[in-house]
A protein has these predicted regions:
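A ligand-binding cleft/hinge motif common to bilobed small-molecule-binding domains
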Residues: 27-36, 81-84, 107-108, 112-141
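Short, Asp-centered acidic motifs that coordinate Mg2+ and/or phosphate
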Residues: 22-23, 112-113, 146
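Periplasmic-binding protein-like
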Residues: 45-53, 118, 122, 126-164, ...
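Ligand-binding clefts/hinges and TM-proximal coupling segments of bilobed small-molecule sensing domains
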Residues: 77-97, 132-136, 164-185
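Bilobed "Venus flytrap"/periplasmic-binding protein-like clamshell domains
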Residues: 28-29, 46-101, 113, 118-122
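Acidic, polar ligand-binding/catalytic clefts
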Residues: 3-64
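Hydrophobic residues within well-ordered alpha-helices
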Residues: 16-17, 65, 106-107, 147, ...
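Short helix-initiation/N-cap motifs at beta->coil->alpha
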Residues: 3-15, 57, 94-108, 142-143
Length: 185
């Protein structure tokens, strides 16, 4: 029986190495570094980092955010995107403990923009949500999610086999459609 545990996303690799958790499954962006240091599955879903602002905000590119307050979750792909984007790196970056805090900051006007996962933003902003006054204005880095286990684990291969079976029988496609996701190739 699995036990699902919320952790500090900024220390996810440390938690895994210390055996506090057995895998990282929730929205883990696959990177070369992670694939070198952990046993990772094949990608299962596509994602991107997006810029979220208040409705009515004039935005044409990340250059509009130079000198503005931009938030992202500490240790996330959003944080990496801010650090690596020529314009966003010149923003006043403030890290938050979770992505939903980033949305609260933008909605409250204490941050000008947030950089976070497309999958989360799609589900949490716009008409009919608690953040109806927010909108996505830019899609930045396209990425893929996978599942990570401790280096040397054979569980990643078993999960890959399960993913292959779930793709073949249409289960993953049906779930992706239900939740507005795009499966990785």
């Amino acid at each position: 029986e699995p036990e699902f545990v919320e952790i500090n996303w900024d220390t996810k690799e440390t938690e895994l190495a210390a055996k506090s958790i057995d895998c990282i499954w929730n929205g883990l962006t696959l990177t070369d570094d992670r694939e070198e240091n952990m046993a990772c599955t094949k990608p299962y879903v596509k994602n991107a980092q997006v810029v979220v602002v208040k409705d009515g905000t004039e935005y044409t590119s990340t250059a509009d955010l130079v000198g503005k307050t931009v938030v992202a979750e500490a240790g996330s792909a959003g944080e990496t995107t801010i650090q690596e984007d020529e314009n966003l790196a010149q923003a006043d970056y403030v890290s938050k403990s979770v992505q939903t805090d980033c949305l609260m900051e933008v909605a409250a006007g204490t941050a000008d923009a947030a950089v976070l996962d497309l999958t989360l933003a799609s589900a949490m902003i716009g008409e009919g949500t608690d953040y109806a006054n927010l909108k996505m204005v830019d899609e930045l880095n396209v990425e893929e999610y996978g599942v990570a286990f401790r280096k040397g684990s054979d569980v990643a291969a078993a999960v890959d086999t399960a993913f292959d079976e779930l793709k073949a029988d249409g289960t993953m496609g049906a779930l992706a459609e239900k939740y507005g996701l795009t499966l990785a190739e």
